[in-house]
Every structure is written in C-alpha cells, then in structure tokens.
C-alpha cells in the first residue's frame, strides 16, 4: 500500500463483505453482488468518507497511536485534497481519477472493436495520457498500459466499475 487512501479503500471492501447478511449467508441473495458493487463501496469509503475532515478528526488519534508521532489535522488535510496530474491511476486525486478510468475504457473499446491493435497500445496510451493529463509515458513503460493488473490478467471491461463510488 502506498498511502492511507489505499488502506481506506480496502476497508471499504471489508466493510461491504462484513455487513452482508450472515443469517442467510447460504443463499445467493446474501452474497456480494459482484465487483461493480464492491468497487462502488470501496471507492465511496475512500473518496467520500476518507477525504472528509470529520473522518480524519476521528481517525487521526488512532493513527498517531500506532505511528508514535503527532500529526496535525491542519497539516494533513491539504495532502488529502491535493490535486496533481499523475501517471498512476491508484495514486490519482479525485479530479484526475475519472480521466484515468475513461482513458482505459476508451482503449479497451478500441482493442475489443478491432480499431486498436495490441501492438499499438503503448503509443495510443501515450497519446491519451498527453491529451487528458498532459503527461507522456512513451519512454516510461512501467507507467504505461500494463501498470494495472487487469489487462495482463485478461480482465477487460472492469475499469468503469471504479467510477461508481467516486
């Protein structure tokens, strides 16, 4: 995990699973509704709760206890709401995050429709990154189209679910 937001996101996944009805756990209706629902809940917790000053007023004393150092709420909040273009989707702020998802969705559509060949993906990725975020990745493969686990693992069509809770 690279930052507290990642922990808060995964807490959202856990809270969703934890609060499914246990008394009917053996029935399909009591199971998770799929990854779209999972992502909506995790991103809701991250983006709506985890960026709220009231959450950090509550959580900060617990964080301080485990880190063993004092952290100021006034010093922390600007970092939580900082907006800056970046190459990595999972590290993106609340303004640019949807652009990362849209970029991936559009590239997936091109690959699935046959208008974009896989061999042309690095250049197409770079063009979209420059158009949407003003950043180039053409000479930086680790921040290019394989930075997420989805496509190398064959998971296409997943990225739009990341916008449901944002």
Model-identified regions with their sequence ranges:
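Conserved binding/catalytic microenvironments
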Residues: 1-3, 25-32
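Active-site recognition of the HExxH zinc-binding catalytic motif
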Residues: 1-22, 39-43
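Short alpha-helical patches at coil-to-helix transitions and adjacent helical residues
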Residues: 5, 35-39, 100, 104, ...
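Buried hydrophobic packing segments
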Residues: 15, 42-46, 107-110, 165
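Divalent-cation-assisted or electrostatically stabilized phosphate/pyrophosphate-binding catalytic cores
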Residues: 30-36, 88
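An active-site-proximal "capping" alpha-helix that borders the catalytic cofactor pocket
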Residues: 35-49
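Long, amphipathic alpha-helical stalk/connector segments used for oligomerization, subunit docking
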Residues: 49-153
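C-terminal substrate/ligand-recognition segments
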Residues: 96, 154-166
């Amino acid at each position: 995990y690279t930052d507290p937001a990642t922990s808060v996101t995964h807490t959202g996944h856990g809270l969703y699973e934890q609060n499914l009805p246990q008394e009917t756990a053996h029935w399909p209706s009591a199971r998770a509704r799929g990854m779209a629902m999972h992502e909506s809940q995790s991103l809701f917790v991250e983006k709506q709760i985890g960026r709220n000053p009231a959450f950090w007023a509550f959580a900060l004393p617990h964080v301080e206890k485990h880190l063993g150092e004092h952290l100021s709420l006034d010093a922390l909040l600007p970092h939580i709401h900082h907006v800056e273009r970046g190459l990595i989707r999972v590290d993106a702020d609340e303004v640019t995050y949807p652009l990362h998802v849209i970029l991936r969705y559009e590239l997936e559509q091109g690959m699935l429709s046959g208008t974009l060949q896989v061999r042309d993906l690095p250049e197409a990725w770079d063009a979209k990154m420059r158009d949407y975020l003003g950043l180039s990745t053409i000479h930086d493969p680790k921040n290019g189209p394989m930075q997420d686990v989805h496509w190398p693992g064959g998971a296409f069509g997943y990225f739009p679910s990341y916008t449901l809770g944002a």
